[in-house]
């Protein structure tokens, strides 16, 4: 299932997700609301193992961060086996040595969720081309722990 969003979210096919540009304000909670709807309508956690993956530039309307955190912790993560968030830097954005890009408000919101012990993995990449390799790493089968 592919969900894209700006200030509104919608489920789209894979080709549209990857190749149809969208612009506009960013309200992340709309995508989480859409994921909640898809889970409720078609993928009950009683019948499916649900894995979520989110890639973002980190932009979110600041007034939406609290709602995003609440949806993630109260609805999305309890329905998922695993959830990964990947934040992509802006292409061509460079910082002098010793300077780093400030954590986005969305990154800080999700970091609070991780700090609470939630099953959420977070990574940053510098380029869109790095998205799939990092998602592959995050979702690779982990060796079983010794009992």
Please tell me what each predicted stretch does:
Residues 35-42, 64-74:
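A short, acidic, amphipathic alpha-helical segment used as a generic capping/interface helix at domain edges
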Residues 11-16, 62-66, 95-97:
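A short acidic (Asp/Glu
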Residues 7-9, 59-60, 90-93:
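Conserved nucleotide-binding/hydrolysis micro-motifs of P-loop NTPases
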Residues 1-52, 59, 86-88:
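Von Willebrand factor
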Residues 71-147:
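Von Willebrand factor type A / integrin I
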Residues 49-64, 88:
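DG-centered beta-turn motif at the end of beta-strands
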């Amino acid at each position: 299932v592919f969900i894209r969003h700006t200030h509104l979210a919608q489920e789209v096919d894979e080709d549209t997700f990857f190749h149809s540009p969208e612009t506009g304000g960013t309200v992340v909670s709309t995508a989480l609301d859409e994921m909640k709807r898809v889970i409720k309508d078609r993928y009950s956690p009683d019948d499916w193992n649900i894995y979520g993956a989110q890639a973002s530039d980190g932009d979110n309307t600041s007034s939406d961060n609290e709602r995003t955190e609440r949806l993630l912790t109260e609805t999305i993560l309890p329905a998922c086996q695993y959830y990964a968030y990947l934040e992509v830097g802006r292409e061509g954005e460079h910082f002098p040595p010793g300077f780093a890009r400030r954590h986005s408000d969305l990154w800080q919101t999700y970091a609070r969720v991780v700090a609470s012990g939630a099953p959420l993995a977070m990574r940053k990449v510098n380029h869109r081309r790095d998205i799939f390799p990092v998602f592959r790493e995050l979702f690779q089968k982990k060796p079983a722990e010794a009992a």
